[in-house]
Amino acid sequence: MALDIKKIEYYNITVEGQVGEGSKLLSVFADVGVNLLAFKAVALESMRTQFTLFPDDGLKMTDGAKKAGLNLDGPHAALLIKGDNDESGALADIYEKLSQADIHVNESSGIADIKGSYGVILYLEQEDCEKAVAALEM
């Protein structure tokens, strides 16, 4: 199982208000040249959404947020993993290796593409990132 593994950071921010607030938020970062590796948006309650943003450049993101008067929660640690084959058991294998290294995954998200590759984001504690990379590269 060949994996491409990248340590990344993520930030959380909650937006409230009317329809279109998410678009305004994402535009703030697009306008300063932030490229998002991934994102997640989850409704917390009516008209309140938490965005989890995974920038390729955390400094650009924090600078853009500061200029726009936005308060980001983060940075937090994560791993972005790309696999070439979404065969049955690929995710189980990743979790097994992390379990054997005594690494707790706080949260994860994944997706497969139509060509058979997949991606997964593992939300980890900062102190577990290097250990997780080592465990997965074995």
Predicted regions and their residues:
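A conserved regulatory-domain signal marking ACT and ACT-like small-molecule sensing domains
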Residues: M1-M138
